[in-house]
């Protein structure tokens, strides 16, 4: 799914509003995912998955940093996320459906924190962006 110029602008503007809250929002999205989709916990058997866990916060920050990097390279997501794609496909062997689940909980988190900025157009653009990120992260599973 190709991001239009409007999509790219919406994604950059929305992520700009996230700003320094990105690590906290990443952790919150992970917590939402673990609560809403308990099977996702199986990929984190060594984590303390309780609310406010330092491990969840640290992984949320990794997720947020990867997305921030992706937002800065919207025209080269495959090149930008290649290492993460290798990691998730070959070492971690994460079921591809989990990227969709995290994308969903991230959208919910952003909508909750940025209600006036989370217009239908921004929602659609962020959804397309996260779908593209998910596609790239699962591209090396074949």
UniProtKB/Swiss-Prot annotation:
| MF GO annotations | haptoglobin binding; heme binding; iron ion binding; organic acid binding; oxygen binding; oxygen carrier activity; peroxidase activity
Show where the Globin domain sits: 2-142
**What does the entry list under GO cellular component?**
blood microparticle; haptoglobin-hemoglobin complex; hemoglobin complex
- What positions does the entry give for heme b binding? 88
Phosphoprotein as a keyword of this entry, yes or no, is yes
Tissues/organs with expression: Red blood cells.
**Modified residue Phosphothreonine is at which positions?**
109, 135, 138
Record-level GO BP terms: hydrogen peroxide catabolic process
Q: Where does O2 bind?
A: 59
Q: Which residues form a coiled coil?
A: none
Task: List residues modified as Phosphoserine.
Answer: 4, 36, 50, 103, 125, 139
Q: Name one Pfam family in it.
A: Globin
The question of whether Oxidoreductase is a record keyword is answered with no
Q: Which CDD domains match?
A: Hb-alpha-like
Q: Which residues carry this modification: N6-succinyllysine?
A: 8, 12, 17, 41
**Residues spanning the membrane:** none
- Indicate where the modification Phosphotyrosine is found in the sequence: 25
Residues with N6-acetyllysine modification: 17
Keywords on record: Acetylation, Heme, Iron, Metal-binding, Oxygen transport, Phosphoprotein, Transport
Q: Which Gene3D superfamilies match?
A: Globins
SUBUNIT field: Heterotetramer of two alpha chains and two beta chains.
Similarity field: Belongs to the globin family.
Q: What does this protein do?
A: Involved in oxygen transport from the lung to the various peripheral tissues.
Report what the protein is called.
Hemoglobin subunit alpha
Q: Which organism is it from?
A: Alces alces alces (European moose)
Q: What is the lineage of its organism?
A: Eukaryota, Metazoa, Chordata, Craniata, Vertebrata
Q: Which gene encodes it?
A: HBA
